[in-house]
Amino acid sequence: MKLNTSPYPVQLEVVLDWDTFVKKYKKAKGIEPEEQSKGVTTLLPDGSVLIYAQDSDPITLVHELNHFCIYTFGFIGLPINDDNSEAYCYYMDSLLKQTLKVIK
């Protein structure tokens, strides 16, 4: 599922089954991903991000989405600190809500 990542100029797709993740990863990078783990967040050559979360596990989703949020804030040059924590938390909330809507 492709998520709405506005207002930031990044692209994110979340994949919930390993076979689909491997197919998309291999198409983008030309190689197979390393051995399966519960979750993976990877930057693709086109600048987009692909996330895999095994069994739609909410804890894994939160973990992997945090990787994406950290990447996004670094990409736009916004440090993650007390001054910007609200922006970070609202962004994380938005991404998690979109994902949970689909898996429920």
What annotation goes with each model-predicted range?
Residues 71-79:
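Substrate-binding clefts and substrate-entry loops adjacent to catalytic sites
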Residues 45-61:
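Short pre-active-site segment immediately N-terminal to the catalytic Zn-binding motif
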Residues 1-4, 17-47:
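Catalytic zinc-binding patch centered on the HExxH motif and its immediate surroundings
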Residues 59-71:
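Active-site recognition of the HExxH zinc-binding catalytic motif
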Residues 79-104:
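Post-HExxH zinc-binding segment in Zn-dependent metallohydrolases
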Residues 10-12:
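Surface-exposed, interaction-prone regions used to assemble/regulate multi-protein complexes
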